[in-house]
Swiss-Prot record:
The lineage of its organism: Bacteria, Pseudomonadati, Pseudomonadota, Gammaproteobacteria, Enterobacterales. The gene is rpsF. This is Small ribosomal subunit protein bS6. PROSITE patterns: RIBOSOMAL_S6. One of its GO terms (biological process) is translation. Binds together with bS18 to 16S ribosomal RNA.
Length: 131
């Protein structure tokens, strides 16, 4: 089986359908003896340019190992699903399991925010003890 990176963008008004879509696509892949190495839901993001007069879309990234028949089926599903406004399927040489730069940046921001909150709380406690 080959490795693939799949990115699809969902209409922002259909964001509540994304978990169900991910479940269906994951079931199709695992049902054909495939494996999902990485699944990231990036959420709603600003588009670089308008697509069908839309400025935002819900992004989903999947790295999978699956037979070609399943990938063909997924591409057909993307093409005929009106909620999916764009999709891309790329073949990769190896399974990608590490977090994408999008998720890494989000985690770093979260860590900085938590560190700042902890420092602020420590400063407040130190100020209380001095009184």
């Amino acid at each position: 089986m080959r490795h693939y990176e799949i990115v699809f963008m969902v209409h922002p008004d259909q964001s509540e359908q994304v978990p169900g879509m991910i479940e269906r696509y994951s079931a199709a892949i695992t049902g054909a003896e495939g494996k999902i190495h990485r699944l990231e839901d990036w959420g709603r993001r600003q588009l670089a340019y308008p697509i069908n007069k839309l400025h935002k879309a819900h992004y989903v990234l999947m790295n999978v190992e699956a037979p070609q028949e399943v990938i063909d089926e997924l591409e057909t599903t993307f093409r005929f699903n009106d909620a999916v406004i764009r999709s891309m399927v790329m073949r990769t040489k190896h399974a990608v399991t590490e977090a994408s730069p999008m998720v890494k940046a989000k985690d770093e921001r979260r860590e900085r925010r938590d560190d700042f909150a902890n420092e602020t709380a420590d400063d407040a406690e130190a100020g209380d003890s001095e009184e």
